[in-house]
A protein has these predicted regions:
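Conserved alpha-helix/loop element of class I SAM-dependent methyltransferases that forms part
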Residues: 19-38
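Short, glycine-/aromatic-enriched active-site segment of Class I SAM-dependent methyltransferases
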Residues: 144-162
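Conserved Class I S-adenosyl-L-methionine
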Residues: 184-243
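A short SAM/SAH-binding and catalytic strip from SAM-dependent methyltransferases
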Residues: 110-123
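Class I SAM-dependent methyltransferase SAM/SAH-binding core
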Residues: 43, 50-100
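A short acidic, Gly/Pro-enriched loop at the edge of an enzyme's catalytic core
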Residues: 99-111
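A short glycine-rich, Lys/Arg-flanked "PGG" loop and its adjoining helix->strand segment in the class I
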Residues: 124-138
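Class I SAM-dependent methyltransferase Rossmann-like catalytic core
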Residues: 5-22
Length: 243
C-alpha cells in the first residue's frame, strides 16, 4: 500500500485530518467581527473533508466560500457534503496548491486555515496569504506552538517534523512583523487532541505495519507523554487598511 492510499485508510471516516473540533472552529469564527448575514467572500485553505468549510457556510449564511485542497479525494468528499446540504450555489471546491493561490489581489474578506499553514511554513503563509485578503480582512490560522518549555522528547520530535514550531510569543511577533493587526489567540483544548488520536488509533489498528504507521504511533506517544508542552493555537489577525 503506497503512502497516499495508506493516508486515506488511516483517516477513514474521520471528519478532521488533525486535532480540532466544531466547538473550537466556532470559537475561532466568533472572533471575526463581521455580521453573520453579511455577503462576504471566504477562502478556506487546506479544507480537507470540509469540517471548517461547512461551519463557515452555516455561520455566514449569505457568503460565498472557496474551499481549496491539494488532494482530490477529500474535495470529492466535500463536494458530496455540499450537495447534501444544498450549498452548491455558494460553496465551491478547487484543487489548488496553497503555495500558489490563483486569485486576484484583495479578493477575500476572510482567509481561514486550520492546521495547514505548516505545509508551507507559518511565516511564509502569513506573507503569501495576505495578498489575497481585502483591507480589514481577517486571517484565522491554527498553528502548532510551544505552550511551555518543551521536554527533550517533544523538542526532538517536533524539531524534526516541523522546524518552525515556536512559542506563542514568537508567533505573535511574526504576525506583527508582517504588518497584521493582531487580534487574539486561544489554545486548542486537550480534548481535541484526545478525540482525534483515539479515532486515528482505531483506524491504525486495522492497517499493516510500516514506517508511515510507526511515525503516526510515535506522534501519539510523544503527545501522551508531553501534552502540556505544545498544542495547536488559533491566531486571529486583520490586514490593516494601509496595506
Amino acid at each position: 500500500m503506497d503512502i497516499p492510499l495508506y493516508f486515506y485508510a488511516a483517516f477513514k471516516d474521520m471528519d478532521r485530518l488533525a486535532p480540532g473540533s466544531d466547538k473550537s472552529t466556532l470559537k475561532a469564527i466568533d472572533y471575526i467581527d463581521f455580521n453573520n448575514d453579511s455577503q462576504l467572500t471566504i477562502l478556506d485553505i487546506g479544507c480537507g473533508a470540509g469540517a471548517s468549510t461547512l461551519l463557515l457556510a452555516d455561520y455566514f449564511k449569505n457568503s460565498t466560500i472557496e474551499a481549496i485542497d491539494l488532494f482530490p479525494h477529500y474535495l470529492k468528499v466535500l463536494d458530496e457534503k455540499i450537495a447534501d446540504n444544498d450549498l452548491d450555489n455558494r460553496v465551491y471546491t478547487c484543487q489548488m496548491d496553497m503555495n500558489d493561490l490563483d486569485y486576484p489581489n484583495c479578493e477575500f474578506d476572510i482567509v481561514f486555515s486550520e492546521v495547514s499553514a505548516y505545509i508551507m511554513g507559518f511565516a511564509k503563509a502569513l506573507k503569501s496569504w495576505k495578498r489575497v485578503l481585502k483591507q480589514n480582512g481577517y486571517l484565522v490560522v491554527s498553528e502548532l506552538s510551544w505552550i511551555q518549555k518543551p521536554s527533550k522528547e517533544s523538542k526532538k520530535f517536533w524539531k524534526t517534523h516541523y522546524s518552525e514550531i515556536d512559542t506563542i510569543e514568537n508567533k505573535i511577533a511574526l504576525i506583527k512583523d508582517e504588518g497584521y493587526e493582531f487580534i487574539d489567540y486561544f489554545i486548542l483544548p486537550k480534548s481535541d487532541f484526545e478525540d482525534y488520536y483515539a479515532n486515528l488509533e482505531s483506524n491504525l489498528r486495522t492497517l499493516d505495519d510500516n514506517d508511515f504507521k510507526k511515525d503516526f504511533k510515535k506522534e501519539i506517544e510523544v503527545y501522551e507523554n508531553n501534552s502540556d508542552d505544545y498544542s495547536y493555537v488559533y491566531y486571529i489577525m486583520k490586514k490593516e487598511v494601509y496595506q
